[in-house]
UniProtKB/Swiss-Prot annotation:
The lineage of its organism: Eukaryota, Metazoa, Chordata, Craniata, Vertebrata. Pfam families: CCDC50_N (PF15295). This is Coiled-coil domain-containing protein 50. PANTHER family: C3ORF6 PROTEIN-RELATED (PTHR22115), COILED-COIL DOMAIN-CONTAINING PROTEIN 50 (PTHR22115:SF1). Phosphorylated on tyrosine residues.
């Protein structure tokens, strides 16, 4: 095999070749680090966007739950108001019926009193009519008494029995009036007791409903607060985990870059151009990395100039 002749005057120096190799290696490492940084930035942006979307969904869900709770409260308020209106209307109807019944009873009592008064006037007129007859009869009765030896006359008996009958009728009417008034007072007291009990029951129902609504509202607020705290805690944990992961990833990448980076060969001792072995230089150059021979020669020639 014929020996290949190499023009030693066009070959670059060893230091220049090592420097060019180091520059190329630095460029490669910088490009790799830049790509890793871009990938990390894109990954962090994707994670941040996902977290924002999750937070928006949670906030929307909480808002919907709050709106539902408010709608339920308004519905309960309306139902309670309607119930109160129905109770008030029922009480008003009862009061109206009671007032009408009382008015009718008063009218009946007035009619009865008027009739009794008319009867009393008629009885009074009858008594006035019987009074002269009683006077005339007393004289004849006296004569009859003295003649018959102590027998009572018929006029005296009628005069004594007529006031007794009138007095007995007045007593019955007075007793009936007292009984009616007592019955009215008893009915009124019973109605007042029923109304007071109904009002107390309505107040108790309203108080219980208000307490239940306050409890439900407080429970909804506590649930919303706990959800917000949990979301904030999850966000902090994710942020801490993300920062720790990024730091560990950067440390691993830096360590890997340091491990993967080959050590630079020590600069060779200065030799005379005539002592340079072309075969030794060719072997060393092929062991490190295969560069373009024409490019290296061109760079070395340019540096010499």
């Amino acid at each position: 095999m014929a020996d290949v002749s190499v023009d030693q005057s066009k070959l670059p120096g060893v230091k220049e070749v090592c420097r060019d190799f180091a520059v190329l290696e630095d460029h490669t490492l910088a490009h790799s680090l830049q790509e890793q940084e871009i990938e990390h930035h894109l990954a962090s942006n994707i994670q941040r966007n996902r977290l924002v979307q999750h937070d928006l969904q949670v906030a929307k869900q909480l808002q919907e739950e709050d709106l539902k709770a408010q709608a339920q409260l308004q519905k309960r308020y309306k139902a309670l108001e309607q119930h109160d209106c129905e109770i008030a209307q029922e009480i008003q109807e009862k009061l109206t019926i009671e007032a009408e019944r009382r008015r009718i009873q008063e009218k009946k009592d007035e009619d009865i009193a008027r009739l009794l008064q008319e009867k009393e006037l008629q009885e009074e007129k009858k008594r006035k009519k019987h009074t002269p007859e009683f006077s005339g009869g007393s004289a004849s009765g006296d004569n009859y008494y003295y003649e018959d030896g102590g027998m009572k006359s018929r006029g005296i008996n009628e005069a004594v029995s007529a006031p007794a009958r009138v007095s007995h009728r007045d007593q019955e009417w007075y007793d009936a009036e007292i009984a009616r008034k007592l019955q009215e007072e008893e009915l009124l007291a019973t109605h007042m007791d029923i109304r007071a009990a109904q009002v107390a029951q309505d107040e108790e129902i309203a108080r219980l409903l208000m307490a239940e609504e306050k409890k439900a509202y407080k429970k909804a607020k506590d649930r919303e607060k706990s959800s917000l705290d949990k979301r904030k805690h999850d966000y902090d944990c994710k942020s801490k985990a993300k920062s720790a992961h990024s730091k560990s990833k950067e440390g691993d990448e830096t360590q890997r870059a340091k491990i993967d980076r080959p050590s630079r060969p020590p600069p060779p001792a200065a030799m005379a151009p005539e002592d340079v072995d072309p075969t030794h230089f060719t072997n060393q150059h092929s062991n490190t990395r295969h560069f373009s021979k024409s490019e290296s020669s061109h760079k070395g020639f340019h540096n010499k100039q």
